[in-house]
Amino acid sequence: MTGDWKNRPARVQLQESDLPSSVPPQTGLAFNVWYNKWSQGQSGSTRFVTPYSLDPENDSGITKGDKEGRIHFCLYFAKGMCCLGKNCRYLHHIPEPDDFARLALHSSALDCFGREKFADYRDDMGGVGSFKKPNRVLYVGGITGALNNKTLKPHQIENRVKYKFGKLGELDSVRYVESKNCAFVKFKLQCNSEFTKEAMGNQTLLIPTDKEWDLRKEGTGLLVKWANEDPNPAVRKRELEEQTQETLKAIKQLVASTEGTVNQKRKVEEINEVRDSQANSRERFSIRENAIIDKTILDKLKQRKVTITNTNVAANITVSKPSSVLPLVTQYSSDED
């Protein structure tokens, strides 16, 4: 994902009038407002292909969240259904290393969308995730339904998963397990795995060049969950070390870029000061150049003014006649006693 999104405002993905109802399709007799699901009906949830999807290249852009210094991403943007566009107060772009560093410095108890994590994973490995056990690996199931039963070779399926998921962040590895008909996708950064889990849920693996593309909504969509932790202690230790290194690397890059921005601002200010001083000196020089009276004539006039002033001062001085001298004290003699 390139940085072109920084030069344009985020676009509206969906008009507000076209937003779907928050109530899911009826599958039971009673609707539970607390869990947002139907009860007393069919067990299990019916999967489908969502009609909304994220187009990172065209949907990404600047929002109010960028201007306000927000660090969390828009959940509806990830699902391809944000109706606010540039007026959204959350971020509208694919998470980058600088975003990961800001999230890591802020809190590890919140995901990239600002939702609170839990101490443990859910039994079905869905949901927001755990703050005790960071996870960069996603389990991807429902591949057959996401392909509308299209027959592909194992390496073709793996490449298609890599193509679809690679748009949402830098991948560390992708492994397709043919016997289980599922895939495991590992990202470089955890924020990308959190973002992708929401963005790729109930999405299709078909591409526009497939002849089944027009019928993609008849499939069942992908099932994206958190992968279970590796039971090997050595692997868990290595994974923790890798995550720590990635976090430190991202924080160092963020600090370096911040310092570079500050230094660049200082250089710009210094250049502006030099330009202002040069402009002032040029202005003073132009005044001298374009003077009405020549400098030599001005000097002669100054000298003449000084001469005239001295003459006037001398003329104003008057000499008074000396007065008769009077004795200061009458002479005193002791003979008068």
UniProtKB/Swiss-Prot annotation:
Annotated keywords: Cell cycle, Metal-binding, mRNA processing, mRNA splicing, Nucleus, RNA-binding, Spliceosome, Zinc, Zinc-finger
SUPFAM superfamilies, alphabetized: CCCH zinc finger, RNA-binding domain, RBD
Domain comment quoted from the record: The C-terminal RRM domain and the zinc finger motif are necessary for RNA-binding.
Native organism: Kluyveromyces lactis (strain ATCC 8585 / CBS 2359 / DSM 70799 / NBRC 1267 / NRRL Y-1140 / WM37) (Yeast)
Name of the protein in question: Pre-mRNA-splicing factor CWC2
Keyword tRNA processing recorded: no
InterPro entries referenced in this protein's UniProt entry, alphabetically: Cwc2/Slt11, Nucleotide-bd_a/b_plait_sf, RBD_domain_sf, RRM_dom, Torus, Znf_CCCH, Znf_CCCH_sf
Pfam family, one: Torus
Disordered: annotated segments: 1-23
Main function: Involved in the first step of pre-mRNA splicing. Required for cell growth and cell cycle control. Plays a role in the levels of the U1, U4, U5 and U6 snRNAs and the maintenance of the U4/U6 snRNA complex. May provide the link between the 'nineteen complex' NTC spliceosome protein complex and the spliceosome through the U6 snRNA. Associates predominantly with U6 snRNAs in assembled active spliceosomes. Binds directly to the internal stem-loop (ISL) domain of the U6 snRNA and to the pre-mRNA intron near the 5' splice site during the activation and catalytic phases of the spliceosome cycle.
Quaternary context: Associated with the spliceosome.
Lineage: Eukaryota, Fungi, Dikarya, Ascomycota, Saccharomycotina
GO molecular function: pre-mRNA binding; U6 snRNA binding; zinc ion binding
GO cellular component terms listed in the entry, alphabetical order: Prp19 complex; U2-type catalytic step 1 spliceosome; U2-type catalytic step 2 spliceosome
Keyword Aminoacyl-tRNA synthetase: no
Zinc finger regions, C3H1-type: 68-95
Subcellular compartments: Nucleus
GO biological process, one term: spliceosomal snRNP assembly
